[in-house]
């Protein structure tokens, strides 16, 4: 089994949202880079990073922080959060991310998912959320019409 400790980044800080609610969050003292260092020091080899600013804007807002983490530490890094176009996938790939996680955009736009998989075959992972038996999108705010099974 592979364990991926997580770092959620909002406003350049490590945070934890309560049930995906951006208005209900805990902010931590440690910076994302310091937290990644701590995980590395504890022997973790993998890291899951979510750019929560990116999830809101659809942009690679915290790309510099993520690139810094990838460059400083020998960790397998997977990145998600608002990745809605091939350009964003390319930026994270160029930054050294091992996997790029697609969520809502992959469910809502099958053509995008197909193009992403064709161009970045070994880099794409799906992050799928479910609620009441249906795939959930847009930060748990909407249910799709797609059953989970």
Describe the residue ranges of each PLM region:
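Conserved, mostly hydrophobic/aromatic
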Residues: 8, 39, 47, 79, ...
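Glycine-rich beta-strand-to-loop/alpha-helix junction loops that act as flexible
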Residues: 52, 78-83, 102-104
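Extreme N-terminal starter segment of soluble prokaryotic enzymes
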Residues: 1-3
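Catalytic domains of carbohydrate-active enzymes, especially glycoside hydrolases
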Residues: 35-50, 95
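Glycine-rich, proline-tolerant flexible connector loops at the mouths of alpha/beta enzymes
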Residues: 46-64, 104
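Conserved anion-binding
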Residues: 12-15, 19-23, 93, 97-149
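Short, acidic/polar
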Residues: 28-40, 84-90, 142-149
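Alpha-helix-loop-beta-strand connector modules within alpha/beta enzyme cores
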Residues: 5, 56-80, 111-129
